[in-house]
Amino acid sequence: MSDSMSYAVLVAATLFLGIGLQIAWLFFSNFIKRKRLESRISEVSIAIGKNAKNPENEAYVLNYLKEKFSPERFENRITDALGLIISVIHIPLSLLITVWYFAMIAGRIFGFMNIEPVVLWVPMILQLLLSIAIFIFSVFIKIVFGRYPGEANGFNKEFIKTIK
C-alpha cells in the first residue's frame, strides 16, 4: 500500500472514529440528562413530601425549584460562574482541536506540514479527554454544591420563558 493510500485510510478511520465518538457521547449525554431528570424528580418529591409528577402538585414543585435555584443563593452564583467558565474554555478548545485536526490533514495533502499519519489520532484523543475532564469536573461540582455547573441559570432561563 502506498504512503498516500495508507494516509487516506488513516484519515478516513480517524474521521469515522471521531464521528462515532461524537455520536456515542451524544447518546451518553442524553442518557445522563434523563438520569438527572429522574433524580431531580425524586429529590423534589422527597423535599415537598408529595409526588412531583402529579400535576396537582405543580405549585409546590415550582416553589421548591424557584427557591433551590434562586439567583440570590451563593452556591447558585458559584455554579453558574463555573458553568460559564466551562463554556468559555470548552468551546474554543474544541474548535481549536478540530481546526488543528483538519489543518494536519490539509498540511499533509498540500505538503506544508509533514507529519506522521499516526499523529492524526492525537486530536481525537484530546477531544475525548477534554469531554471526560468536563464530565468529571461537573460531577465533582454536583457533589460539592448539590447542582451541576450552570444548572441554576438554565432553570431560571426556562422559568422566565414559561412565564412569558
From Swiss-Prot:
GO terms for cellular component: host cell membrane; host cell plasma membrane; membrane. It is found in: Host cell inner membrane. Probably blocks the subsequent transfer of the phage DNA across the inner membrane into the cytoplasm. By this means, P22 excludes superinfection by the phages of the same family and also against DNA coming from oter phages. It is a multi-pass membrane protein. This is Superinfection exclusion protein A. Keywords: Host cell inner membrane, Host cell membrane, Host membrane, Membrane, Transmembrane, Transmembrane helix. The chain crosses the membrane at residues 8-28, 85-105, 121-141. It comes from the Viruses. It comes from Salmonella phage P22. Signal peptide: none annotated.
